[in-house]
């Protein structure tokens, strides 16, 4: 196995370049509604119009798909600048259906999953993001099913959904989402380009909100995101409110049921996934959160592996060789596998800058080999690293107030001990 040769060379002080150059994208290649970072060309024309057709053309589709429809299917599938998309939204409580029109403005993201474009609702002047994904006509779309369940300040809001077709009779699902202008990825890179570090208050603020969103997904909804990375973390650059997006890989994990291990973008992929585990838990998301937090301090990925083998090597170079029990906890099938002994590096040498003991402690609690030893999302929110946010005098660098951080619902705190609740909600925020 190449990982053993790589680690043996590291242990002996030699450099070894792996010949394992198997092409591996940053995200898995398994189904149409999973996000993948590849390019797709688009055209630009102006002021063409797509309009909703009658529901008759949906009659040939399976019942599962028809149940997902708010209206009929739109004929045409344009995302070109200026194109008008007119659809309908079902009225609530016996109210009439609403006609809604969107004007496509420009593409803001592309990939094998489809395309995301910015648009404006003509009735309200509100900016939205529309994610268009190819829909398998045989199945319900898992991303749509999950997004309809979500309602949290740190999760991007699904406003509307509709289906559209092409001349080739391809069916596309269009998810109309709230528009958030920035990503944590771009925010982090902007500091790196200026040879600056992201201010600590932003690292604390962003990581805290990610953890709060993870607690909501894991404990309230029962969903594992499975692709947490800076590109999937939206941030409002005025309020600095963070929202998780892209649920194309998300899934409700059922104990005892197998799942694919080739999931999650490589740099943020938990080691049990690299070991091929199929009965993993939402702890894979918490590993990803630890990777994101470290990246905000470093300005670059903590574990930048070029292949799955290289990824494991990068992890072991920092965390050291996993103990036999840790390997068993990640995947029992690898219980007897022997790795060369590599010592773990202390965190202060990893960060190479003045980082608080609290920050290093949280990173170490998130980046544990054993999934069951990683702290939960709610435990992470209560960590002393975030105590600055709980200070009643805390504010953004420009003096503006922090976004709401402590307005937990009863569902979010369900099962939390009195002590944990006390640590989570500062006295000034208690009702």
UniProtKB/Swiss-Prot annotation:
Compositionally biased tracts (Basic and acidic residues): 26-39, 46-65
Alphabetical list of SMART domains matching this protein: S_TKc
E.C. designation(s): 2.7.11.1
Bias kind Polar residues: ranges: 12-24
Top EC class of this enzyme: transferase
Name of the protein in question: Shaggy-related protein kinase beta
Known catalytic reactions: L-seryl-[protein] + ATP = O-phospho-L-seryl-[protein] + ADP + H(+); L-threonyl-[protein] + ATP = O-phospho-L-threonyl-[protein] + ADP + H(+)
Keyword Ribonucleoprotein among record annotations: no
Family named by the database record: Belongs to the protein kinase superfamily. CMGC Ser/Thr protein kinase family. GSK-3 subfamily.
Domain Protein kinase: 102-386
